[in-house]
Amino acid sequence: MTKTAKVSDIVRDWVVLDAKDKVFGRLITEIAVLLRGKHRPFYTPNVDCGDFVVVINANKVKFSGMKLEDKEYFTHSGYFGSTKSKTLQEMLEKTPEKLYHLAVRGMLPKTKLGKAMIKKLKVYRDDKHPHTAQTSKKDAK
């Protein structure tokens, strides 16, 4: 008989991932799997059974090809002529946290459950983070 997970039965872990010298896309897919809980044997799609993920050294990640110069992110406020664009290099220097959230958000469900999952992602530029008390089990994969 298939057992479905209940919210009361889930014990969340804190996973620290070091982004230094890792390929961005592969790291993002690993983060999305951990946030959704698909690595657990009792994964249930309609229950948030994922872990908390802390990413350190966020701006030291690698990109393949010419993505740093070629890839652009667009924003639009709704007013005429207000389209602005930033390259991947600019996003990585100014707001790497936003870059990770945008990439992971695209891999999560576009529902209330997805919003709850993305709140469990913590991204930091360097190797210092305020979650050292929670991260006792798994450190720096």
UniProtKB/Swiss-Prot annotation:
This is Large ribosomal subunit protein uL13. Keywords: Ribonucleoprotein, Ribosomal protein. It comes from Helicobacter acinonychis (strain Sheeba). The gene is rplM. Belongs to the universal ribosomal protein uL13 family. Part of the 50S ribosomal subunit. Disulfide bonds: none annotated. PROSITE patterns: RIBOSOMAL_L13 (PS00783). InterPro entries: Ribosomal_uL13, Ribosomal_uL13_bac-type, Ribosomal_uL13_CS, Ribosomal_uL13_sf. One of its GO terms (molecular function) is structural constituent of ribosome. Coiled coil: none annotated.
